[in-house]
Regions:
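Helix-to-loop junction immediately C-terminal to a conserved catalytic motif
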Residues: 58
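Conserved ABC transporter NBD signature motif
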Residues: 66-78
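Short helical segment in ABC ATPase nucleotide-binding domains corresponding to the A-loop/adjacent helical element
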Residues: 99-108, 118, 122, 226
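Conserved ABC ATPase "signature" region
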Residues: 114-133, 185
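Conserved ABC ATPase signature
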Residues: 137-141, 145
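A short, proline-enriched helix->beta-strand linker immediately N-terminal to the Walker B motif
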Residues: 156-160
């Protein structure tokens, strides 16, 4: 069976930024495809360029070489078809209520009336379990609740791709685990397309169904893994721990030529939509 064309294509993208002393290459010729309803995770150590890559997909950074395409059209700037959830708690306007924070983005698109925007905002808040806090202000919310508002605001925009840049990194371990579960519950309801950045191997396996490994700086593709077999309930299993250890070796210990010995195939464009999960 042939597959549909990818929704998002990152084609040999190299990204650079200027420091005080020199130009730094963040990623080098990174290539991957994301299909509709994928939960695609970019996993790598700090400084590998994964957040910069997410910003390039969002349209905030222009590639030095290569191209990013959404639905076959080149990404040339930000747009409502790609919405980002960051890790910072201060991404909400503190002078607006929870509902007003969600409505603000909807009204900015100039496609919905005030009543329509309010209705969609309430629908999104219900999806993340915050109906009872619609009139609350951000300073009264916990960190996890603020991130749920940010997710509700993003999903209310109905983007083609939801971009999440280490959204739970600043949360305590218990809240982070619950937020991971809630993202998966929302995905089961809505089947949105997710591009998720993390430096946590365990989080990547729980959240993603496909995981792209990026090498230490500058970020280059090491391998792509199929993580369909894993989820919150499998985190303590032997297979989960063995896979996490294998990923660690791929990221830090093994040269590129040793990928095959780790039983993980290097990234290649798939001929079929489904792939076998790692043993």
């Amino acid at each position: 069976m042939t597959i549909a064309a990818p929704l998002l294509q990152v084609d040999n993208v190299s990204l650079e930024y200027a420091s005080a002393q020199r130009v730094v290459r963040a990623t080098h010729r990174v290539r991957f495809d994301v299909h509709a309803a994928d939960r695609f995770v970019l996993l790598g150590p700090s400084g590998c360029g994964k957040s910069t890559l997410l910003k390039a997909v969002a349209g905030f950074v222009t590639p030095r070489e290569g191209q990013i395409r959404l639905d076959g059209a080149a990404v040339t700037g930000p747009g409502p078809d790609r919405v980002v959830v960051f890790q910072e708690f201060d991404q909400l306007a503190p002078w607006k209520t929870v509902r007003e924070n969600v409505v603000f983005g909807l009204r900015a698109t100039r496609t919905l009336s005030r009543a329509e925007a309010r209705e969609r905002a309430d629908e999104s808040l219900a999806q993340v379990g915050l109906t009872g806090f619609a009139d609350a202000y951000p300073h009264t919310l916990s960190g996890g609740m603020k991130q749920r508002v940010a997710i509700a605001r993003a999903l209310a925009m109905r983007p083609r791709v939801l971009l999440m840049d280490e959204p739970f990194a600043a949360l305590d371990a218990l809240t982070r685990a619950r937020m991971q579960e809630q993202v998966l519950e929302l995905w089961e309801q809505l089947h949105f397309t997710l591009l998720f950045v993390t430096h946590s191997i365990e989080e990547a396996l729980v959240v993603g169904n496909r995981v792209l490994l990026l090498s230490p700086h500058p970020g280059q593709v090491r391998a792509e893994l199929n993580a369909h077999a894993f989820g919150p309930q499998s985190a303590g299993s032997v297979a989960f721990q063995q896979t996490a250890q294998r990923i660690h070796r791929l990221l830090f210990d093994l040269p590129d030529a040793a990928l095959d010995d780790a039983k993980v195939a290097p990234l290649r464009r798939p001929a079929v939509r489904q792939r076998e999960a790692l043993p």
